[in-house]
Design a protein with these regions (language model features):
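Short, Lys/Arg-enriched N-terminal segments with co-localized hydrophobic residues
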Residues: 1-9
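Residues that act as N-cap/strand-start positions at coil-to-secondary-structure junctions
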Residues: 9, 37-39, 50, 71
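Hydrophobic beta-strand residues in large extracellular and virion-surface proteins
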Residues: 15, 43-45, 77
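Sequence-level detector for tyrosine residue identity
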Residues: 4, 31-33, 63
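Mixed-charge, Lys/Arg-rich low-complexity intrinsically disordered regions
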Residues: 8-34
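Generic beta-strand structural signal
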Residues: 17-19, 46, 57-58
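Short coil-to-beta transition motif at edge beta-strands of beta-rich domains
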Residues: 34-46
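Short, compact, well-ordered microdomains
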Residues: 50-79
């Protein structure tokens, strides 16, 4: 399957903290969430107008492999 075909079926949303926990989630709409992110899960993040493939991991806090930002909350992602 080509990357182009896969991109057509990806959902775009915003990284948010899950209410009442330290877990991260993706919000797609007012009441539409991914359901929580797990270590090792792959996603794309929009940086300077371009989609960059990465994966989410947990050290002292959540981070995206190869992405150097101070705060993940509010980043536009697709999965």
């Amino acid at each position: 399957i080509s990357r182009y075909i896969l991109e057509e079926h990806m959902n775009t949303g915003t990284l948010v903290r899950q209410r009442g926990s330290d877990c991260l989630d993706i919000r797609f709409g007012l009441y539409d969430y991914h359901g929580g992110l797990q270590c090792g899960e792959t996603l794309d993040v929009k940086i300077s107008g371009k989609w960059v493939p990465t994966r989410i991991e947990m050290g002292e806090d959540w981070y995206l492999v190869g992405i150097d930002v101070d705060d993940l909350i509010g980043l536009i992602v697709r999965i």
